[in-house]
């Protein structure tokens, strides 16, 4: 019996996506990553069909005994590698994690201070996103243009004058750490809470190449589980025993999630174990690669942001491409060559230019997980030059990209031997391992 045409189309699209993005492109989106085959093997399980409202061992459904076990184990593992006391894995994204925290800390009309948009504040921190939807007034802290960061002295003065309910640090264009330990005492002095959005840098924190916000004075930390932490898409909230965490945890259900996508839990646990054993080497290679790529692009004539600061301390590189037509044009041109990046506002762009900003945001974390190192960053920079500066034939560059990827198809920083997994596979589900 042949498949209906509609079904064939679904299968064709899915296969095309897998072939294209898994084997033929340089994936340089800073907010993406790839799970290991090991994590993927437990992602598809019976958990994907089940519900478990509430917290482990305090559910509103029956049939959750293994859900309770895996969720508790995953939280314990995440606390271990994060060096934290509290973890909640129920947020289904970093933005949902932010929403839960913001809603508990303030009422409509209250004020919150955020890192300036020029320093990379995420849209959920602004009036255009979650804060605005909750009716919380956001005020941007002053920007230090030279250091591409929060202006510490001016921010302290603003905190003392405004007396906000909370202050948010962290961002989405995030080259350098925000001044957590410098601001924390002043935030607490006015009775406010310090929230750190570590969505982009969570894997770097675990890998000990980025300082821990909780150890520097943050009251609560929100994360994504699919950026520099290479797990399934989702969110999480951490604290070091703060009362705020308890309040937030009580409201995640039923305010922000009902069921929390249980199939994420085994894959998150596996990724946490991988990060426990391989996270430091992975994070160190990420930061070496980002710096190598930034330097290689600068050497080839690109205007890379942050030259006076060493370009970057994270997984990201930011490039001003105004002279070549702007971020929108260049991101599309690179995609034609199978190089996947995103257009991005740069510190001197106005928010209304979001559709055609000055820059590109590049992330090296996924290609690092496929085994690329500094020498490959040189090659990638040369490919950028061929497309953007030299204006080489796009199809020829595309062939070079595909040839390059042939040597980088296997996920690294994981456990190699998959044979032992067969005894855990459900024959009825036919898990792919």
Swiss-Prot record:
Homodimer. It is found in: Cytoplasm. Its EC number is 2.1.2.-. It comes from Saccharolobus islandicus (strain Y.G.57.14 / Yellowstone #1) (Sulfolobus islandicus). GO terms for cellular component: cytoplasm. Belongs to the SHMT family. The record marks 226 as: Plays an important role in substrate specificity. GO terms for biological process: glycine biosynthetic process from serine; tetrahydrofolate interconversion. The keyword Amino-acid biosynthesis applies. Catalyzes the reversible interconversion of serine and glycine with a modified folate serving as the one-carbon carrier. Also exhibits a pteridine-independent aldolase activity toward beta-hydroxyamino acids, producing glycine and aldehydes, via a retro-aldol mechanism. (6S)-5,6,7,8-tetrahydrofolate binds at residues 121-123, 243. Pathway: Amino-acid biosynthesis; glycine biosynthesis; glycine from L-serine: step 1/1. The modification N6-(pyridoxal phosphate)lysine is found at residue 227. Its cofactor is pyridoxal 5'-phosphate. It comes from the Archaea. One of its GO terms (molecular function) is pyridoxal phosphate binding. The lineage of its organism: Archaea, Thermoproteota, Thermoprotei, Sulfolobales, Sulfolobaceae. Keywords: Amino-acid biosynthesis, Cytoplasm, One-carbon metabolism, Pyridoxal phosphate, Transferase. The keyword Amino-acid biosynthesis applies. PROSITE patterns: SHMT. This is Serine hydroxymethyltransferase.
